[in-house]
Amino acid sequence: MGTQTPLSENYKQYPVDLPCDENEALALLRMQTARGLGIQSAHLLLALCGTAQALWNPQNEDQQQARHLAQTKFPDLFSTSTDQRALREWARVQSLGLWTWSLTLGPYPHNLKQCPDAPLILFGQGPLNALGLNHPHRHRKLISVVGTRSMTPYGQDFLIDFMADLATTGVIVVSGLAQGVDICAQLQAHKNGLPTISCLAHGMHQIYPAHHKKHLPLLLEQGGLITEYWYGERAQPAQFVRRNRIIAGLSEVTLVVESPRKGGSMITAHLAKSYERTLCAVPGRTGDLNSAGCLDVLARPDYAHLVRHAADLFRHMGWDDFVPQTRKQVVPELNLAQQDVLRALRQRGRATADHLSVDTHRPVSEVMGILLGLEIAEVLYRVEGGWFVPKTARN
């Protein structure tokens, strides 16, 4: 899944100030690493015991029955090797300055805790403790934003406007770190002063994709990274699917910006619905493959809400106390030559400098200079292959 990128130099940037019971954390780590014990069985044992450490120190009949069940079906849970692995990981977490959230004792994200397959323990980096995620009646809201890695200018345009509208709301933005919609959502949220949560599908020893490590200082400035995977666990395809349940579970609402019919974004969308969370999607043209998934969920009766801008999402959520910022869209002043070229580009939808040279009867060299000015004015995008696309007007 790509080259690992060490992150150890960043670990001690923030203090570990979230309380976590050490004995409970060790017990949960044993459950997490024991062979044969899946997340559903682990949740069943915890429901019987109340705490993980009760499996090793039962105090009542229910806990004794749970211990007997675990010893019979999951003997590796009580092995010396499992205990040693858990002790090593806990020592590493402490030495690296990570904080932990345990499902059973201490702080844990309230929304995620309601999910039947919530991770037993989460590791994190960054000042997320200031966001109050473990309080059910906290003031801040969470929005998960997902979408394709192959984001188009349409999706980018939407996210720029959407995050700008959220600037005064204090909403927390949750996403992954993939190319495309994920990283665009994270960076635009940061640009507008919004805290972000980046959900990883691997251990804290790396960033995947590696070239997104350059964004780490921004991501840790007013939010942070979380993962259920141990230090050294590499990114594997199945882990991205498992990670998606954290993205869907952390927030009250999941927003799909652009997505084909199949892929991680659609998995996250359906997970959100299975957790009885609100699902929203951005509409697109019927012929666009990157909008096919969004259109599919919007077409299903009572499944997803159509979102054109932040006000739509807030209305669907009933967040009357959160008013998205209303902004006047700044229209740059263009000279006659720029207006001429932009008009021709909009008529075509997308074009090269050669096309626009023919359409406007101007030399290619002059058109290239005009296009550069229009790009600086942020009224068009330059895309691969020497093509230009006009910026989509807001609805």
Tell where the protein language model's regions lie, with residue ranges.
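Short, small/acidic-rich helices and loops at N termini and domain boundaries
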Residues: 2-107, 377-385, 390-394
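Glycine-biased, small-residue-rich flexible motifs in mid-sequence functional cores and linkers
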Residues: 2-24, 103-395
